[in-house]
Amino acid sequence: MNIQALLSEKVRQAMIAAGAPADCEPQVRQSAKVQFGDYQANGMMAVAKKLGMAPRQLAEQVLTHLDLNGIASKVEIAGPGFINIFLDPAFLAEHVQQALASDRLGVSTPEKQTIVVDYSAPNVAKEMHVGHLRSTIIGDAAVRTLEFLGHKVIRANHVGDWGTQFGMLIAWLEKQQQENAGEMELADLEGFYRDAKKHYDEDEEFAERARNYVVKLQSGDEYFREMWRKLVDITMTQNQITYDRLNVTLTRDDVMGESLYNPMLPGIVADLKAKGLAVESEGATVVFLDEFKNKEGEPMGVIIQKKDGGYLYTTTDIACAKYRYETLHADRVLYYIDSRQHQHLMQAWAIVRKAGYVPESVPLEHHMFGMMLGKDGKPFKTRAGGTVKLADLLDEALERARRLVAEKNPDMPADELEKLANAVGIGAVKYADLSKNRTTDYIFDWDNMLAFEGNTAPYMQYAYTRVLSVFRKAEINEEQLAAAPVIIREDREAQLAARLLQFEETLTVVAREGTPHVMCAYLYDLAGLFSGFYEHCPILSAENEEVRNSRLKLAQLTAKTLKLGLDTLGIETVERM
């Protein structure tokens, strides 16, 4: 049930009846303060200006045409022409009942789309580090939300599995007579990579051999392809352990690395030349874009093939977008890549549009994010100044959560404690990131993320168990409760019910904008409203059974909404804490 969409349509029709144009925007929003009702229509200002009348006068005319019978108990004009809408308690009660009767909590399904989501994208032959965390968990929250809404989601893990580094690695493995790469662990590969790079930079003979191996690999030589596959396999096996620990839905089947697009690149360059978009410039093949200017104010040249015949990331990204539209039949493509790549992506997509590879009707969206910073406001590093490995970060999260949980539950059995520590520790790391607006940098702080107060995973997980504890004490007859009516008389009951029914609106925003922090803010607010409701509206000691059952049903929908909301974020809930 999307109340905002329902009210928007009702207000829009009333505005048209009052003389507004058919494309008028009612701007119905959730009210910021209870005295302004549950919703507020703010669109009268802009429309009244076009019609040459006072906003309040337009609002008065709109009210004469606005039929919210059975939806609102009161509608009033405030200030210069805002329309405040107070939802009818009977309407709230009816829709709480409907939400409880539905596995989807009354959430409707929009028109189904095929949506490709590009996220995580670690490099082969390197361990995942904290720089991969944001893309991986923000992208996964978007995927979970879109799938819940009923879309066909194609996860695309665009791993770095191609390029000159593979010539180096294979040459170094061979030099060390360790061709049997399958028995190596990734930590070894990282060491190999460093050694190979050192030799590549210092030993011209070795560098030449590495370059030859790249050519052989790219030409499809079976021995080199097999060595390359081993390197990819070791990496992806290790990464899968990290994905599983993070409770992320990516699998090996979702890998669509750079190598997938490599065979397409010569054809792309030839086609761009044939279309007159790409030209030769100083030996390289370049596309000049009017939308981007260089320092001299001239159209910027984007290289798609180097002098030596090599291709660039831009060429791969052009092929990638083309493939996602033509082969995967995407209706929409989302990229969870950090903000530093924005211009690069915009240039690749400008070429894609000019070439007609992806029509304008298919959005290509860069859902960029900021950096993860330490308490000092600088990029998050180890004490020695190195890159923090993701596995090490998760180990520390688990260890800290273990201590925290053991302190609060000294008698808890070891296996139960481990399970709880895992849910709290991993949940804390993920939620701390997801609860921040992805477009900004955020400070990584263990103390804040593991706190039981504020907008944190431990607080949200505890809030969920607190609601469940009501049911443990209540000794409920499920059938009797299901048949009982919901009755809303108190203000706090109405406020909680209205917020519960805004779950679909929240999901819709997350799906449209790729902003999981909006879901975190909603769930945190919901937990706070339940806390106030629980304090002021006795449940188990209510004045009669009818009120008791009605309040139990509000508690029941709160628990289900918290669980489902946290699930769309990939945060595990627990029964006890």
UniProtKB/Swiss-Prot annotation:
GO cellular component: cytoplasm
A GO term for molecular function: ATP binding
Subcellular location: Cytoplasm
Gene3D superfamilies: Arginyl tRNA synthetase N-terminal domain, HUPs, Isoleucyl-tRNA Synthetase, Domain 1
Motif annotated as 'HIGH' region, chain positions: 122-132
SUPFAM superfamilies the record matches: Anticodon-binding domain of a subclass of class I aminoacyl-tRNA synthetases, Arginyl-tRNA synthetase (ArgRS), N-terminal 'additional' domain, Nucleotidylyl transferase
Name of protein: Arginine--tRNA ligase
Species whose genome carries this gene: Shigella boydii serotype 18 (strain CDC 3083-94 / BS512)
